[in-house]
C-alpha cells in the first residue's frame, strides 16, 4: 500500500515505515500529525485517485528530526574584470516517518 500526498509544494510517494525529508514544518520532534492533502492511494489492485484530493484519506506521520541540508554554493563571475560574487545557502528540512495510511 502506498499513497501520494502534497506538502511544501511538492508531491511525495510514500508507504508505511518510510522516512521522508520534507520542506521545514513548524512541528516539534517526536510529535505526530496528519497530512490531509492525499492525491492518490493504492492498495494492491484498489486504486483511489482524488479530484484533486481523496475524500477521507490521511497520511499519519511522526517527526523524526529537524535540520539543514548540504550547502549549495552560488557563484557569479565576470571574466577579465577581477569581479566575483560568492554566496551559500542551506535549506531547512523536516524528516518524518510515515506511521500509517488511511483511505
UniProtKB/Swiss-Prot annotation:
Segments forming a coiled coil: none
Pfam families the UniProt entry points to: Ribosomal_L21p
Free-text function comment from the UniProt entry: This protein binds to 23S rRNA in the presence of protein L20.
Protein name, entry field: Large ribosomal subunit protein bL21
Family: Belongs to the bacterial ribosomal protein bL21 family.
Entries under InterPro entries matching the protein: bL21-like, bL21-like_sf, Ribosomal_bL21, Ribosomal_bL21_CS
GO CC terms: cytoplasm; ribonucleoprotein complex; ribosome
Superkingdom: Bacteria
Organism annotation: Actinobacillus pleuropneumoniae serotype 7 (strain AP76)
PROSITE patterns assigned to the protein according to its UniProt record, in alphabetical order: RIBOSOMAL_L21
Key word rRNA-binding present: yes
HAMAP family for this protein: Ribosomal_bL21
Gene that this polypeptide is encoded by: rplU
Subunit structure: Part of the 50S ribosomal subunit. Contacts protein L20.
GO biological process: translation
Keywords from the UniProt entry: Ribonucleoprotein, Ribosomal protein, RNA-binding, rRNA-binding
GO function terms (MF aspect): rRNA binding; structural constituent of ribosome
Disulfide bonds: none
Amino acid at each position: 500500500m502506498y499513497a501520494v500526498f502534497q506538502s511544501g509544494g511538492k508531491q511525495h510517494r510514500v508507504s508505511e515505515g518510510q522516512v521522508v525529508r520534507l520542506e521545514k514544518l513548524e512541528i516539534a520532534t517526536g510529535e505526530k500529525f496528519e497530512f490531509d492533502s492525499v492525491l492518490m492511494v493504492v492498495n494492491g489492485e484498489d486504486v483511489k485517485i482524488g479530484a484533486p484530493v481523496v475524500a477521507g484519506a490521511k497520511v499519519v506521520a511522526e517527526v523524526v528530526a529537524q535540520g539543514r541540508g548540504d550547502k549549495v554554493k552560488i557563484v557569479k563571475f565576470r571574466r577579465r574584470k577581477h569581479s566575483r560574487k560568492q554566496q551559500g545557502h542551506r535549506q531547512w528540512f523536516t524528516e518524518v516517518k510515515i506511521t500509517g495510511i488511511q483511505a
